């Protein structure tokens, strides 16, 4: 297939040296992504990965292997995998560079190793806080020969219990082949949190005849520390009870609020933005998507085709009747976007209690030639985020459904408008402007979108049409996710009918959504990966050269959109994680938030 490149066999794990990953990873996603091998450059077939360095030997290789067994990896980080540090003399520097966090309750580490010929070793340890942890102990000699048969040695990491501290442990293993002067040094990094032990209250004493008295906890008088403890518990319970009542009242109050305060400034400014390099759309066949597994399975929703069209206009109006306002409170100004039958206006909303107070708003409406089905779909799809409150969501606040008037949907105003149009404007602006949108800004936008989607996932709300076209932005670069009402009309090139009389965002959809019409938070994660790609390309259309009818087969074969120009490997790895064929192998939105936040902080360190 033209314009396509491959990244090896699909279905392999992102974790180097790991096989058969199934269970969810508890460590942060960025730590797993840090172990990813470098991805190939866009538009080129993946070159063979550079061969890892081998153990130095003057003759045939000694075939040394050292790894963590599947049981050990599962015990430490919850993955069903073997983690190799050395496999048949090949050293995995990705695995060695990872500072593994040891659970605080774990005191022993087990390493599996063997060699086919004579290899001498020397073992040493360093601890950065000897007050918190004793020097590690091993159940083998610190110097000797690597066993010729498969063996396991144990390292004991015991805390002293004297102080609270995170301890950094370095285990250094020197391997020498055939007693030569050449040797290989392997450094294993571990982290463990040690805690201070609570002193036990001594309750036994000797009587005058040196006989031991028996302590009776039932009849013994309470000590001062015991009384203080129970008083503290009582005070804490009372405080928690009061806080719970206050939170419940605030929650009920917020749920009753219909009108959201909109403090967005009315002034807009044109920010100078740089023009990125143009690129030809290319595609990759990626094995990287099959990586970070989620903590739990995703709830799946099967959507029947044309289910929105089964709702009548009367029913749609009935669902929004409680937030309906008078048409007189809305003043329409400029047309921001216009399609075949739909429009989005910049409007002014007059306050119900004080006519002198005005707020800016988005107003979605339809033209006179709009059909009843189109009007119904606008009202129904506008309710997707209704009643949800999050700083990165933009739900509707009011509607106008008066008889004889075309329905209007009102949303809070964001003065830089639609995110996709904003990104494309960034591409068109010349590079000589004083200000330019940075890669760090784009990552910050992605974090905000991931935060909003994480909130939806916790509320078990499936968006089903996440894309840059369904987000808005203001002059502070705050991004909010909106519904997809009128998107089919305003962005017709992003939707395609595959013979079922239903326009769908084919290029943003996961394979299970395309083939089986199944939607879940996992399919939203897939769409987020495409949205992240949109951000990094400043609004380009994904898979633009692929026939929509061939998308399902294309994705099933393992092909994905190529890495954007100037997109860091780590960021493209995040996208690739979102495009795993198996929904269970895609990361959770909360993992994506954490990963992108860490990456954003790393970018800031270089600015």
UniProtKB/Swiss-Prot annotation:
Keywords recorded for this protein, A-Z: ATP-binding, Cytoplasm, Disulfide bond, Glycoprotein, Kinase, Membrane, Nucleotide-binding, Nucleus, Phosphoprotein, Receptor, Signal, Transferase, Transmembrane, Transmembrane helix, Tyrosine-protein kinase, Wnt signaling pathway
Domain WIF: 66-194
Annotated SUPFAM superfamilies: Protein kinase-like (PK-like)
PANTHER family with a match to the protein in the record: TYROSINE-PROTEIN KINASE RECEPTOR, TYROSINE-PROTEIN KINASE RYK
Organism, scientific name: Homo sapiens (Human)
GO cellular component terms given for this protein: cytoplasm; glutamatergic synapse; membrane; nucleus; plasma membrane; postsynaptic density membrane; presynaptic active zone membrane; receptor complex
Function: May be a coreceptor along with FZD8 of Wnt proteins, such as WNT1, WNT3, WNT3A and WNT5A. Involved in neuron differentiation, axon guidance, corpus callosum establishment and neurite outgrowth. In response to WNT3 stimulation, receptor C-terminal cleavage occurs in its transmembrane region and allows the C-terminal intracellular product to translocate from the cytoplasm to the nucleus where it plays a crucial role in neuronal development.
Protein name as annotated: Tyrosine-protein kinase RYK
Family in the record: Belongs to the protein kinase superfamily. Tyr protein kinase family.
Residues carrying a glycan: 139, 174, 178, 182, 209
Subcellular location: Membrane; Nucleus; Cytoplasm
EC main group: transferase
